[in-house]
Amino acid sequence: SNPRIGEAFTRLLRALAEGTIDPHEQNTTVNCFLGEDECMSAYRAAEALTSADQPEEALQILTNAVAKLEETGHFADNETTVYRVFDSYAARLVYNQVKAGTLPAPQDCTILQDKGKETQLAPDSYAFCLFELAYLLYSRDHIDEAIRYAKKAITIAPTMSAGYRALGRIFVFNDDFANARATLESALTLMTSPDDIAALYYHLAYALWKSGDPETALASYIKALQTSNVVSAACVSEIEELQKDTGLPLPLSEDIDRLLDEARVPLVPTESMRAVLEEAAITALDEGLFDIARVLLSFVFRYRNDDALVGVLRSLETSLF
């Protein structure tokens, strides 16, 4: 009943009949069935062009690829179905829980609009193109278009941090600190990956600093450092600059959560988020879905250092190899 599936089978059978692919080569067979990913090709080409200092050409390639995909209507939301992108089992789990109303989310969370609809997957490359478009448009001062693509990216990939970070950055550099803070704090409540959480605290810290709240900004920078080292170099550099500008001392590590809480900055992951991850990991174990259980438990372990969890994780890793 799905025309795209029919086209895929026709393409694969024709290639097999003509002998243009080897049926024993799994990757070749899968790629033939899926067809050419024009968005991924455009994304890679745009990366190369951006590195070669040709941003206008990169913009054109990405814009054309996204427009071509959207013209097909294959991944257009409708009254019964939405198309979304996820980068991990945990991200999909959070989406499902928010959509079902069993995990709290901000009132402006785009996931809430998906209630009652079937969720199907869109290509990852579609989201990557939207992220890159938002960044390139912002860097070329096409602010309104950059905001539009960043918001579209958030809708398509609501549990990935890149769209929120792009939108937050655009707001900050247009001195719209209220919207920057709201965007980044909303994103924090939906993330499970320590790297994503750290990156969001880092971007939030900069927004807080430039909005005139350097004390909370310092706490947010340190929270990012406590969470992951993915943005450590940038955090240290900006902390030094902030202290040079303001003369503020570093807050004590044990005071960070209190300072953020007093400033109404979300402390994540919340207990409810941790409980959802742990319960899902146990369910996956019971069902024999060991790969999924390992991924979920690895997140739980990052936030709850438990010797028993170490043993379970090691056992799972052994069973997978």
Regions picked out by a protein language model, each given a short descriptive name:
Residues 5-9, 13-23, 87-115, 175-182, ...:
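Alpha-helical linker/edge segments of TPR/alpha-solenoid repeat scaffolds
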Residues 37-40, 44, 132, 166, ...:
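"A position-specific structural signal for the A-helix of alpha-solenoid helical repeats
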Residues 47, 135, 169, 203-209, ...:
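Residue-level recognition of tetratricopeptide repeat
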Residues 70, 124, 158, 192-195, ...:
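Short coil turns that delineate tetratricopeptide repeat
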Residues 75, 129, 163, 197-200, ...:
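TPR alpha-solenoid repeat register
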